[in-house]
Amino acid sequence: TWNRQGDWLERIEKALYHTDIFLPSYQEAVQITGERDVQAMGKMLRRYGISIFGVKMGEQGSYVTDFQKEYFIPPFATEKVVNTVGAGDSYVAGFLTAQIKGMGLYESAVFASAVAAFTVQTMGAVGGVPSADVVEEFIRKQKR
């Protein structure tokens, strides 16, 4: 939830010690860490034992690291943007789906970005979320 007092870290710190994958939005990560650089955010949060840290940055794409490798993932081009509601949640769902399917860090972030690209092209938070097979075909057809 949004917190205007600026004590985000204090509110979630105990949970961070039990978090393996942490994928906040850029704005959330700034509020939590006080940092503006995504790499500095990751360094600060690593002390909690997080295995994978990523930042969703909307039209700037995303950043993801396992603290050994790091990737900046550009967003997929879309024909139109109808509504961005749910894009971040779709990104997280896509990332976790890819991890469960055994994909690596980079592939998971690309998969997540593709799911978010589908989401922004339709009205509503979940109306545009396709099956994993459709997402994989979409990725194969892209020039990246």
Give the ranges of each region predicted by the language model.
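Conserved beta-alpha-beta core of the PfkB/ribokinase-like small-molecule kinase fold
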Residues: 1-43, 51, 61
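Conserved phosphate-binding/catalytic region of the ribokinase-like
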Residues: 9, 38-144
